[in-house]
Structures are given as C-alpha cells and as structure tokens.
C-alpha cells in the first residue's frame, strides 16, 4: 500500500508540469541558420505589481509614524523592480549584432561598473529607489578593479572584432563567482567605418557572505567567505565544523583561490582541511578550453592526506585504520579547430588530443591483496585521449538560478580514453568511452544524456568494468496564474562488470534518492528516477526571492546477475523552499523535508535538512581530462 501511494505521488509529480497548466508564453527567436535562442517573457508581474505596491505603500505609511518600525521595515521590504528580473525579448540575437562589426578594429575599450544594488544591467538609465541597507551595501562593497576586468577580456585595443569571441567573453564574465551579469556593446566611430569602440558593462555581486549548514541537531558548519578580495578577484574562505558524534568534535577548513593568473586564464588555489581525524592539504592549478579558439588546457595538482577510516580486513571484520597517502595529477591537452558544414557550430567544432598522469602513493594503509582493498593500492596511471567536441550556448533564466541570465550548453562530446595502469600487484591496459549530447526542443525543453563505459583488461578478461547512463530533461516554463512552473526529470543507471569482491555501490543522496543514506543496501547495479517540480513565485522580501518545490525519487539496487527491477523498490518524496538574493554571493538558503515509505534499519523515515546550496551547473561538452570511470 505504501509503495502504491508513492507511485501515485510520483506520477503526479512527473505529469503535472507536462500538462497544459495555464498559458505557455515563450518567445523564440529564429535566425536563418535555424539556431534558436530561448527567451522567457514575464507578463504575470503587472497586475500583481500594482497590488503589491498598494500593499507596500499602506504598510510603509503606517510604519513611518514610528522610527523603530520604519527602520525595521526598510530592512525587509523593497519595491519589486520593474525590469531586470527576467530576460526581455530581443529583436535580434547577440551574435547577429556582433556580426555587423566583424573585422573592424577596436580603437578603445571602456569599462562601466554598475552598483551591486542599483539599476538592472539591461536598463542602466533607471534610478530605482534604494533602502538605507542597499546604499550601505554599495558603499561597503569594493567593485571589481578595471585591471581585473581587462585581464578577463579575450581581446585588446587594436584587435579586430571577432563575434564568436565576444559571445564567449560575456559568458566567461557570468561564470565568475563575483560577477552577476555582464554585457559587451560596440559603438561606431563617426566618420570612420573601420574603427569601433567597445563598451564592457559589468554588475558585481556583493562578494562577502556566510552560510550555516545544519546536518542534524548535533552537527553542522559555519562558513565565511569573500569572493572578490579587495576587488582583485581572489577568493578566500574559512569554515568551522562541529560534530558531537566525532572526537575531536570540532575542526576547520581554509581555501584561497585565484581565478585568473596574469591573464593566462589559469585558475589556481590552495586548500587546507583539518577536522574529525582527517588532515588534508592540496595545491592545484587548472586551465580549461574557455573559448572556442583556446589551444591549450590542462591541470596540475598535489595533495597529501591523513585520515582514520573503518576498513574491512580480508576476514571481513572492520578495523579502524590510519591512512596516509599522497596524489600527484598532471593533464595537458591540445585543441584543433575543425571546419564544418554545420553553420550552427561554425567555429565551435574541434578535435582534442590529451594525456594524463596520476600517481597514488600510500605510506600507511590497511591490509591489502591483489583483489582486496584495491582503493588503497599504490598505483600509477598513464592515459591518452582523443575527443570530438562541438558546443555552443543559449541564454535563458529560471532554471537553476532565480532570474539572472543563465548560459545553456548544447552540443556533442565523443571521447575515447586509452591507457595503462601500473599497480603494485599487476599491470593492466585500460579503455573507456564517453558520449554526451545536449539538445533543445522548442516544444518540450532541454534534453541532455551522457553514457560512459570503461574497464581494465587482465588475465584475458575485462575486470573492474563499469557502465553508466544519465538522462536529464528540463521543461519549458508553464504558468499557473502568477506562478511559473518548471519540471526536472532525471534517470541514472550504473552497472559494475567483474568488480572485485569488496567493491560495492550504494545509493547516493544527491543522484539517486535524496537524503537516503544507508550502508545496508548495496550491490553492483542500480537504477534511479528523480522528479522535481519547481514553483518560481513573485514573493520577495528585501530582494530575496522564494522558490517552492516538491520532489519524488525511486530507486532499485542489487547484484550484477539479477534484473534491477526484481530488487526491492525504495523511494522518497518531499517538499522544500529555497530563498536567494541574486545580488549577494550568499548560497541559496534551503529547507528540505523528505519522507521514505520504506527504510532499512540504519535510517529514519523522515529527514529534514537546513543548508546553504550552491547553484547547480549544466553539463558542458568540452573535452575532459582522460580518466578511469568511477564506479
């Protein structure tokens, strides 16, 4: 009966956003090359805006009679801005706009930096009413320095206009942790058809913040951070952790990151963690294929870890073992642009060749053998890769963020990884394959799928093999009066092939059944379905927007030689709320409640989480560092 109730609720969650709820109001601009740019047009604010203003005016009039109530009201209420919350309809795509100036020489670059709390990026001529708290925020915030903005430009004065490069540059600005949005405009020079000026307009986030994570009533963490230290784009974070179940019960972590070293677009950082019998230090540097014409990418990292862990002995008894190990990781890749007849992916198609070396060394560890506790073997892995990639971006909003511009990748990645593992017990060749694709369907929404398979070859057979499949759909926006609805559906499948005896997979809280954490359910094969229906409301409080959601997850897990559907079904359903002010770097405040109709003995049927949540990220189709696929 419980499973039947769960099925009914899941069906409702899956079907509700797909049915015709209200009027679907979308503007889709099509160009001659059939490229589609998705624009969500918000027409539901007008009536509510009038009623909201009347309510606020009445409330403010009453509160103004008392100094204390007036000050308190200024802290929590502002008038909802007329523009800037949603992407407006454009007459032409930005790419077509930049095409008008292709090949012209850049005479001068001018930078304009808007206030954190102020006019929206796409209508900077307006002068909105600001509360005293917002004015204080603008005065205490250090805007990103001009030098840092110029360091993040892909072009310089004297260069010629490259439309694709300008599009990439806007996206790169939006990917920075301290920039809310950015736009690039081109201005003609009167009397000179060959010269233009470029205007770069940016809007910062308020870069200092903190968040509180409550895992349960006996454990949690507090983090403070500055994402744009002194306006130079450096990030510094400190975290204090407490868990009364552990001894010692308190710990801390520190992280320092530089986003762009001297205009090389190399990200570097150092992090240190010491808590709950674990100490780790890591130094790393990373450069991605950040633009269509980037030729070189790679990373290098060094880490040292010491930790206590409960590990099985060969006789299957558990023993608390001190692990002390180090890891060195080096990857380098070269990109070659390919010519294509597909206009949609012109200058967006490439072939990438890469190589990677990983060295894992254990100085202290558990009892091991050739086929036991493989994760604690000393090993060296050398991998090479060849990848075909094509990728471009559309802009939309109200997907993972609460109204700001989001870049949606579409494209294809096909990558082959081949290499060799030198283990302390054996030497084995490795082969793996990755295929990923992202598509936008105007009548349905966004579809992404990813397939991974790989394994090592030893003693005339494949061992430690794995097959993974993930499919994700994001629906178009549907309207229910003033509420905007969007649904997210996910399917995850994992199967192990000839894994070692002590290798098992478990349900993962974030990928399978949310909040479902147990050590009693495991296997070599699992399948899960996730559904979330998100309601974007027009409820604001001091620019904090409220988003409500409901979710339903089901999963199966079991042995390799048994159909996954013949295992017991486990499920979870729940509700939650997310709150965020997109002018701040504060993580999204989230309250999430779940109920599980059937649970193993080491779990409770109810779970409540209060936490800070970072934005989820879309799957990109850039070539990746070759790797052995995780099980």
Range-by-range predicted roles:
Residues 2-4, 20-462, 473-631:
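Immediate N-terminus of the mature polypeptide
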Residues 466-467:
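Amphipathic hydrophobic-ligand
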Residues 9-17:
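Bacterial N-terminal signal peptides
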């Amino acid at each position: 009966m419980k499973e039947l109730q769960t099925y009914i609720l899941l069906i409702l969650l899956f079907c509700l956003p797909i049915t015709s709820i209200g009027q679907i109001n979308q503007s889709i601009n099509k160009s001659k090359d059939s490229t589609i740019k998705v624009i969500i047009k918000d027409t539901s604010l007008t009536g509510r805006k009038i009623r909201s203003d009347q309510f606020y005016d009445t409330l403010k009039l009453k509160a103004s009679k008392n100094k204390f109530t007036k000050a308190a009201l200024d802290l929590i209420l502002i008038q909802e801005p007329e523009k800037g919350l949603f992407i407006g309809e454009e007459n032409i795509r930005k790419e077509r706009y930049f095409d008008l100036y292709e090949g012209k020489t850049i005479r001068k670059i001018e930078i304009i930096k808007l206030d954190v709390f102020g006019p929206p990026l796409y209508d900077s001529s307006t002068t909105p009413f600001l509360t005293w708290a917002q004015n204080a925020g603008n005065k205490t915030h250090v805007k990103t320095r001009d030098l840092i903005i110029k360091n993040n430009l892909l072009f310089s004065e004297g260069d010629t206009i490259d439309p694709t490069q300008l599009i990439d540059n806007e996206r790169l600005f939006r990917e920075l942790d301290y920039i809310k949005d950015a736009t690039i405009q081109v201005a003609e020079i009167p009397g000179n058809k060959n010269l233009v000026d470029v205007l770069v307009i940016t809007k910062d986030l308020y870069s200092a913040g903190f968040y509180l994570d409550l895992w349960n009533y006996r454990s949690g963490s507090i983090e403070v951070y500055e994402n744009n230290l002194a306006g130079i784009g450096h990030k510094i974070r400190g975290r204090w952790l407490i868990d009364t179940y552990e001894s010692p019960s308190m710990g801390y972590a520190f992280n320092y990151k530089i986003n762009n070293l001297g205009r090389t677009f190399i990200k570097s950082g150092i992090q240190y963690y010491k808590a709950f019998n674990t100490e780790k230090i890591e130094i790393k540097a990373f450069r991605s294929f950040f633009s269509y014409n980037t030729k070189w990418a790679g990373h290098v990292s060094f880490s040292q870890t010491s930790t206590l862990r409960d590990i099985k002995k060969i006789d299957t008894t558990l023993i608390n073992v001190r692990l002390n190990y180090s890891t060195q990781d080096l990857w380098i890749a070269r990109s070659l642009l390919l010519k294509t007849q597909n206009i949609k992916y012109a200058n967006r198609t490439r072939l990438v060749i890469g190589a990677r070396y990983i060295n894992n060394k254990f100085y202290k560890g558990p009892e091991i053998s050739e086929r036991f506790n493989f994760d604690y073997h000393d090993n060296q892995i050398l991998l090479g890769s060849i990848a075909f990639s094509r990728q471009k971006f559309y802009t939309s909003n109200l997907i993972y963020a609460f109204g700001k511009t989001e870049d949606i990748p579409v494209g294809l990645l096909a990558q082959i990884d081949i290499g060799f593992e030198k283990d302390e017990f054996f030497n084995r060749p490795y082969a793996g394959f990755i295929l990923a694709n992202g598509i936008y369907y105007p009548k349905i929404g966004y579809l992404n799928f990813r397939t991974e398979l790989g394994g090592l070859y030893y003693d005339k057979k494949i061992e430690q093999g794995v097959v993974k499949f993930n499919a994700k759909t994001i629906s178009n926006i549907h309207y229910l009066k003033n509420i905007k609805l969007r649904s997210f559906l996910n399917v995850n499948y994992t199967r192990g092939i000839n894994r070692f005896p002590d290798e098992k997979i478990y349900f993962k809280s974030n990928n399978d059944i949310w909040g479902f954490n147990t050590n009693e359910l495991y296997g070599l094969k699992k399948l899960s379905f996730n559904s979330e229906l998100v309601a974007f409301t027009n409820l604001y409080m001091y620019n904090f927007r409220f988003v409500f959601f409901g979710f339903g997850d089901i999963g199966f897990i079991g042995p390799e030689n048994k159909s996954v559907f013949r295992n017991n079904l486990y499920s979870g359903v729940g509700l939650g709320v997310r709150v965020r002010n997109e002018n701040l770097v504060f993580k999204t405040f989230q309250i999430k409640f779940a109920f599980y109709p059937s649970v193993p003995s080491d779990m409770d049927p109810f779970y409540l989480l209060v936490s800070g949540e970072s934005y989820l990220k879309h799957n990109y189709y850039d070539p990746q560092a070759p790797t052995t696929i995780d099980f």
